[in-house]
């Protein structure tokens, strides 16, 4: 099974965040936000068949957005913005996630430079990587094409 790493989008602040076991299936995502994306956590099944709980990366305050994917539901599109907030040069300010079941989830406030990753055909998001300190500085995705 091919795995593609796309991104990240955002700034260079914070520390690098990544997963150690390649992902096979994304189970759910939790995002905390306010004027920016404050934290992200997610659960996935690895290529080894084990379930992994990752994060939260960043801080946990703000409004919670919970995404629990159905057994055949997948993330088909992710978009958002990144830019200066809170005297920080470049952080992720907004995320919009669309699933194969046409569920749309939004977190944060659109502000800054836009990015969009619509996935073609059977492509779907199976995990995340990026940079974080007290907020999410940058975000990227793992995709099965």
UniProtKB/Swiss-Prot annotation:
Keyword Repeat: yes
Annotated stretches, region: 2 X approximate repeats, Gly-rich: 6-64
Organism the protein comes from: Oryza sativa subsp. japonica (Rice)
Origin: domain of life: Eukaryota
Sequence repeats by residue range: 6-15, 54-64
The keyword S-adenosyl-L-methionine belongs to this UniProt entry's keyword annotation: no
Name this protein carries in UniProt: Salt stress-induced protein
Tissues where this protein is expressed: Sheaths and roots from mature plants and seedlings.
PANTHER family attached to this UniProt entry: OS05G0143600 PROTEIN
Domain Jacalin-type lectin: 3-145
Matches recorded under SUPFAM superfamilies: Mannose-binding lectins
PROSITE patterns: JACALIN_LECTIN (PS51752)
Gene Ontology molecular function: carbohydrate binding
This protein's UniProt keywords: Lectin, Repeat
TM segment ranges: none
Pfam families: Jacalin (PF01419)
Disulfide cross-links: none
Expression triggers: In response to salt and related osmotic stresses.
């Amino acid at each position: 099974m091919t795995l593609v790493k796309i991104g990240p989008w955002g700034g260079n602040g914070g520390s690098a965040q990544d997963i150690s076991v390649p992902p096979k299936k994304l189970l759910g995502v939790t995002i905390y936000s306010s004027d920016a994306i404050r934290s992200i956590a997610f659960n996935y099944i690895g290529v080894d068949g084990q379930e992994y709980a990752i994060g939260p990366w960043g801080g946990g305050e703000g409004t919670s957005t919970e995404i629990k994917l159905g057994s055949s539901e997948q993330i088909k599109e992710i978009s958002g913005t990144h830019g200066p907030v809170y005297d920080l040069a470049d952080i992720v300010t907004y995320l919009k996630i669309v699933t194969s079941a046409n569920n749309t989830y939004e977190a944060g406030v659109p502000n800054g430079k836009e990015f969009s990753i619509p996935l073609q055909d059977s492509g779907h998001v199976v995990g995340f990587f990026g940079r974080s300190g007290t907020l999410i500085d940058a975000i990227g995705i793992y995709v099965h094409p």
